[in-house]
C-alpha cells in the first residue's frame, strides 16, 4: 500500500496505533492521531477526523528557483492549526478526470501560531500535487486533513539529538529544532546536518541560521553541498560515516538520531523504512557506527 493511501486509510478509520519506543506515533512507525486531546476543542482547525477542510491561500513567494513559501488562512484569526510537533497534513485536489491526488506536507509555522499555517514546498518535475500547489493564486483554496503525528516531542526527552536531512526533508527536522529552541526549559542539544545539491537548493536557510545564531550554546548547523562554490564555508560532498563518527556522541539512551530526506540519503546513512508503519532495521553508516532502531527514527 502506498504512503498516502496508508495515511488516508488510518485517518478514515480513526485508528490509533501503539507507540514504538519513546514515540507517541509516527509516519514511519505508527500513525497516532491525537483525537482525544483536540477533538471538539474550539479554535483548533484540524482535529484528526476524516473531514477535508478547504483553506484559502493568502500569499506565496519564491524562496529558491523551484520552491515557494505558502501562507494559508485559517477560518478565524484566533484559530490555531491543532498540530503538534512533529506532524504533517494531507493535501488533496481532484484532477479534471475526477481522480484524487493526495500528498502529505509538513508545515514550518509555529504550531501555536494563530490565523494561518505556512509551508515551504518544492515543485518536482511531473509532481502532480506540487505543480498544482505552485499554480495556486491568492484566494484559491486547497483541501487539507489531519494531523498525522510523526513524533510527539517532549522537552528534554534526550540530552542531545542529531537531525540528518537532505532537500525537502528539512521540514520535520526544522519543526523539531524550532520546538526545542522556543522553549527555554528544553535544554536538548541539537546538531543539524543538512545536505543539498547546490547552495541555491538550501531551504529555509535564513530561519535555520537565525536559530543557530540565537542559540549558539545549544544548536549547531552544518551544511553539505554536492557542488560547492569557491567561497563556500560549509562541507563539500555527502554526509559521511567518518563525519558522523566525529560529531555524534555515539548510540545511547540519552541521544537520538532523526533522519529525513531522499531515498539515497536513507540508503547511505540509515537504511530505508520497510513500510509507512515499519521503521525497519538501521543500515548504512549509522549501523556501522553501532546505532540500532532504538537510537534512530526515520521520518
Curated annotation (Swiss-Prot):
Record's catalysed reaction(s): 2 Fe(III)-[cytochrome b5] + NADH = 2 Fe(II)-[cytochrome b5] + NAD(+) + H(+)
Residues noted as binding FAD in the record, renumbered to the chain: 157-192
Residues annotated as transmembrane: 13-35
GO molecular function, one term: cytochrome-b5 reductase activity, acting on NAD(P)H
InterPro entries per UniProt: CBR-like, Cbr1-like_FAD-bd_dom, FAD-bd_FR_type, Flavoprot_Pyr_Nucl_cyt_Rdtase, FNR_nucleotide-bd, OxRdtase_FAD/NAD-bd, Riboflavin_synthase-like_b-brl
A Pfam family it matches: NAD_binding_1
Protein name as it appears in the record: NADH-cytochrome b5 reductase 2
Origin organism lineage: Eukaryota, Fungi, Dikarya, Ascomycota, Saccharomycotina
Amino acid at each position: 500500500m502506498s504512503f498516502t493511501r496508508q495515511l488516508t486509510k488510518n485517518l478514515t478509520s480513526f485508528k490509533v496505533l501503539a507507540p514504538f519506543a519513546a514515540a507517541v506515533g509516527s509516519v514511519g512507525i505508527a500513525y497516532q492521531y491525537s483525537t482525544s486531546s483536540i477533538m471538539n476543542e474550539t479554535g483548533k482547525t484540524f482535529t484528526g477526523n476524516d473531514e477535508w477542510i478547504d483553506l484559502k491561500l493568502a500569499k506565496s513567494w519564491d524562496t529558491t528557483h523551484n520552491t515557494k513559501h505558502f501562507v494559508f488562512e485559517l477560518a478565524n484569526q484566533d484559530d490555531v492549526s491543532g498540530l503538534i510537533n512533529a506532524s504533517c497534513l494531507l493535501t488533496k485536489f481532484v484532477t479534471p478526470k475526477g481522480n484524487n491526488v493526495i500528498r502529505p506536507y509538513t508545515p514550518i509555522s509555529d504550531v501555536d501560531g494563530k490565523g494561518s499555517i505556512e509551508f515551504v514546498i518544492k515543485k518536482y518535475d511531473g509532481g502532480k500535487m506540487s505543480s498544482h500547489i505552485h499554480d495556486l493564486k491568492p484566494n484559491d483554496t486547497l483541501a487539507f486533513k489531519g494531523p498525522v503525528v510523526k513524533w510527539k516531542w517532549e522537552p528534554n526527552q534526550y540530552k542531545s539529538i542529531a537531525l540528518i536531512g537532505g532537500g525537502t526533508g528539512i521540514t520535520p527536522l526544522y519543526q523539531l529544532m524550532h520546538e526545542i529552541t522556543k522553549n527555554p526549559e528544553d535544554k536538548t542539544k541539537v546538531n543539524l546536518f543538512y545536505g543539498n545539491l547546490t547552495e541555491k537548493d538550501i531551504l529555509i536557510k535564513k530561519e535555520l541560521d537565525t536559530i543557530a545564531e540565537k542559540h549558539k550554546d545549544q544548536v549547531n548547523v552544518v551544511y553539505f553541498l554536492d557542488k560547492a562554490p569557491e567561497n563556500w564555508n560549509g562541507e563539500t560532498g555527502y554526509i559521511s560515516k567518518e563525519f558522523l563518527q566525529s560529531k555524534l556522541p555515539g548510540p545511547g539512551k540519552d541521544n537520538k538520531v532523526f533522519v529525513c530526506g531522499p531515498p539515497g540519503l536513507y540508503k547511505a546513512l540509515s537504511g530505508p523504512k520497510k513500510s509507512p508503519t515499519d521503521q525497519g532495521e538501521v543500515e548504512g553508516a549509522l549501523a556501522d557506527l553501532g546505532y540500532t532502531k532504538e537510537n534512530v527514527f526515520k521520518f
